[in-house]
Amino acid sequence: LDISHRIIEKSAEFMTQEANFLKNCQHPNIIRLRDYNLEARRPYIVLDYLGNISLKNEIFNGDRRVSIKKTSNILAQICTALSYIHKKGFVYCDIKPSNIMSRRQKYTLIDFGLVRPIGMEITGGTIGYMAPEVLQNDSKNVKASPTLDIYAIGILLYELLTGFHPLASQKIYNNKNSYSFDRQSITDKTSIPSRASDLNPFLPKAFDGILLDCLNKNPKDRYQSMDVLLQNFEKAVARSI
């Protein structure tokens, strides 16, 4: 057991939200809260130290494309963590590569400052991973739902399997480990991402439907649970071998 820790200073609101959620969590793919004091002169939380390599490093510093087998391993770990969160009645609300730490083939969700109870108004997110219904309303009056996390997982899967963000073309990719986004391309219901198999010739077309179901602009037409998404993905993986 690695018992090294790091102390992270955050805004009081996010820190309180994160500590209150993590103190009741026990999952191998969710960062572990070791200690916290929100009443101290300088409030703090103490979390397990997971190194400094995130999934973002693997995407941008590697070949910008991950094998189907490795993607399946990543998805299995993160989907089970998100399913656990949803079954506890919460939505993570900030899935992105930099919030997934990578260490010895283990992938761990970190940064729970935006987690919200299902049905409550969300407080933000990261453009490029926020669902279109959130951007359309500037986060106002948008209720937290598991379909928000499913949309973001669709973005992540697309990046892993193709090396590209589905809503940021190659022309506007920059070399500073980030993308540029046209907000309208995210919210426009007529804007459909390129099929992943068109960008990755080694990717079976069965994965196209899974990704497009995650990325549907209508939340009612997305997968409604992480468990079903994972089952469908694993079936596609089995057929591709």
Placement of each model-derived feature along the sequence:
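AlphaC helix of the eukaryotic protein kinase fold
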Residues: 5-24
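Activation-segment/catalytic-loop signature of the eukaryotic protein kinase fold
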Residues: 36
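Conserved short submotifs of the Hanks-type protein kinase catalytic core
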Residues: 40-54
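AlphaC helix of the protein kinase catalytic domain
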Residues: 55-66
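Activation segment signature within eukaryotic-like protein kinase domains
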Residues: 74-75
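Catalytic-loop of the protein kinase fold
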Residues: 86-102
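Conserved HRD-motif arginine in the catalytic loop of eukaryotic-like protein kinases
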Residues: 222
